[in-house]
A protein has these predicted regions:
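Active-site-proximal mixed secondary-structure blocks
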Residues: 1-39, 47-138
Length: 138
């Protein structure tokens, strides 16, 4: 079947893409702003793209009005983030962190999550304590 992508709505294009690439790993990205506020947000446009050097990628879309998301702003300002993988036990909390809260709202608190400082002393971003077994400081 041939899809003329330029004729599809943005929503239909998204649905086509997300139903084509399966299974879909979700990067649960934790960042910290320069003032120390922690942000957690899930990204389903995520994958590993290289083993040597180890590289992961995820796509950060914008907000409806063209505003940048906190995750992107924090990464640009600090250069640091931690990728956690979502598992079945944390799926509900992940959905809560997907809500478009105002910047002042602590997603971790809303989702009942806790965090621990990264084991990499050069990295200030946090990893989720009750996430999956995989956390990658970047």
């Amino acid at each position: 079947m041939l899809f003329e992508m330029d004729r599809l709505s943005e929503q239909d294009t998204y649905k086509l893409l997300v139903s084509t690439v399966v299974p879909r790993p979700i990067a649960w990205v934790v960042t910290q702003d320069p003032d120390g506020a922690i942000n957690a947000a899930p990204y389903s446009f995520f994958n590993a793209v290289s083993g040597n050097p180890p590289i992961v990628t995820f796509g950060i879309g914008g907000r409806g009005a063209g505003d940048a998301k906190d995750t992107g702003n924090n990464i640009r300002r600090t250069g640091q983030f931690v990728v956690n993988l979502v598992n079945n036990a944390t799926a509900e909390a992940m959905n809560i962190t997907a809500i478009d809260f105002p910047h002042s709202v602590d997603e971790l608190q809303e989702a009942g999550l806790s965090f621990t400082p990264s084991s990499n002393s050069l990295l200030d971003a946090e990893r989720l304590l009750n996430s999956s077994r995989y956390s990658a400081p970047c």
